[in-house]
Amino acid sequence: MLVVVSPAKTLDYESPLATERFSQPEFVEHSAELIEVCRKLTPADVSALMKVSDKIAGLNVARFEQWSETFTQENARQAILAFKGDVYTGLDAETLSDDDFDYAQNHLRMLSGLYGLLKPLDLMQPYRLEMGTRLANERGTNLYQFWGNIITDKLNEALNAQGDNVLINLASNEYFKAVKPKSLDGQIITPVFKDCKNGQYKVISFYAKKARGMMARYIIENKIDSVEALTRFDTAGYYFVEEESNAKELVFKREEQN
């Protein structure tokens, strides 16, 4: 079972590291190509392109300038520990064990606009470049065209290496659009998390993002290797709803939160 999640805009390069182990990202040459494009952008360009404040634009122009093709523990940290935000609050990687990190390294992948696809312990320098950014480059007008089949091919490698063909999609639509389902050597299953609000069950973004992280952790901690086992996910009050689920979607619901 392979799990994919989105990255996060919020980053943490200050907190103590939960593990000293690390690996190197695989697509540095591709990332360097994007960095060269980004280095031609002014702060005003970045602000308009990414729809961010002048302050955040300035920060990211500086990040593009400082980015290096050499990744060390001085200029980078493990992706699973660098990303913060709702998904990663649910995942809570800081409290994973060494065995958990081993399992995650083989079974979890993070999609990324700049890095393409990251293993949890891959070193990552700070950046902001969302997959939906319409950044013109030599391969096309956006990052989906830039990455093409590269991400899907690497996911196929990971699926084949672990011996089954199930991919659990815990990523957002923006990021999963970088995967080409027709070229994927596996069955895609997308968990859907619905929370009760005013008597109605619906996807509430904040809760759904956190739930994706909690499910990723559940898979890692329990070494989940079947869809049937995944339906027993019950973290934070979620429960599986078989009658609303199908071969492509697993629906989980939760009662209203006070």
Swiss-Prot record:
Transmembrane segments: none annotated. GO terms for cellular component: cytosol. Pfam families: H2O2_YaaD (PF03883). GO terms for biological process: response to hydroperoxide. It comes from the Bacteria. Belongs to the UPF0246 family. This is UPF0246 protein VS_0505. It comes from Vibrio atlanticus (strain LGP32).
